[in-house]
Amino acid sequence: MEKDFFRKNGIDLAKSILGKYLIRKYENKVIVTKIIETEAYMGVNDKGAHVYGNKKTDRTKPLYLDGGHIYVYLIYGMYNCLNLSANIENVPECVLIRGVEPITSLDEISMNRYNKAYTELSKYQVKNITNGPGKLCKALKIDRSLNSKSIMGEELYISDFYYDDKGKKVFSKDELDIKTSKRINIDYAEEAKDFLWRFYIE
């Protein structure tokens, strides 16, 4: 995706990346997943956002970068969460990637997540392999070493196509049935907890 693609406001970007491919490369490995769940955080006036009240700290600096930069933060002291800066520089809106669907390298994803082969997983484990922000970061080996880097780099990027095991280009769909709901686990955000800024496809 080109730079301008990520300069949308947070809500538009959260919708636009649904159905696109999140691709992770490391140690000569390539993992392809499809983005199926996102949340928008709309900057300094959003009580659910880390930058509410224009709180610019060392932690939130990536959100003030131009759209298309990676913001990884830790929750509960152990789980990484992947976000993308949206809009333009110094407009700190972002998108949290909440869920992805594994497309390729299922064993690699499974080893990262559960330390066993994909064929050894229970139905419950398969269902829950990447359906949460901390889960997908563990499955894709996403950590804070990627913080502030471009989502258009070599290590982690978003694309509207990938190459299958036969070398054929597979493109994302343009027509999607996007669902909306309240964002998850932000009960502290007063009226903002009721905003319908969570987006997902089934």
Swiss-Prot record:
MF-aspect GO terms: alkylbase DNA N-glycosylase activity; DNA binding
Enzyme Commission designation: 3.2.2.-
Biological process (GO), any one: base-excision repair
InterPro entries named in the record: Formyl_transferase-like_C_sf (IPR011034), MPG (IPR003180), MPG_sf (IPR036995)
Pfam families (UniProt xref): Pur_DNA_glyco (PF02245)
Keywords assigned by UniProt, alphabetized: DNA damage, DNA repair, Hydrolase
Hydrolase in keyword set: yes
Gene3D superfamilies the UniProt entry points to: Methylpurine-DNA glycosylase (MPG)
Xref: NCBIfam families: 3mg
HAMAP family: 3MGH
Family: Belongs to the DNA glycosylase MPG family.
Protein name, as recorded: Putative 3-methyladenine DNA glycosylase
Organism annotation: Clostridioides difficile (strain 630) (Peptoclostridium difficile)
